[in-house]
Amino acid sequence: METAQKEEFTRVQRVSDNKYNLITADGKLLSKQWFDWIDYFHEGFAIVRREDYLTNFIDKQGKLLSEEWFSWVNDFKDGLAVGQRTNGEYFKIDKQGKILVVSE
């Protein structure tokens, strides 16, 4: 497995299918779900990407921020993140998963 250390988690890559997850300091997987990519945490959330290239956020308890998956998202900055929905709408999302601003 390839590993990269950042914060209190270690990113690991499963060799059989090249999927990523995070391992906690006590050796437990952060999420039951494996992802095509997991970024580092910014303001308590890491960007995750699925096989279909859609993105979301995962928190430090392994919970996805939103039920909706997005075309792309940026890291959180000052409590908000910017992204684009699959229908082309741009948005801002807060740390509770609430879509605050939507525009085309």
Predicted regions, residues:
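Residue-level detector of conserved, function-critical positions
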Residues: 1-104
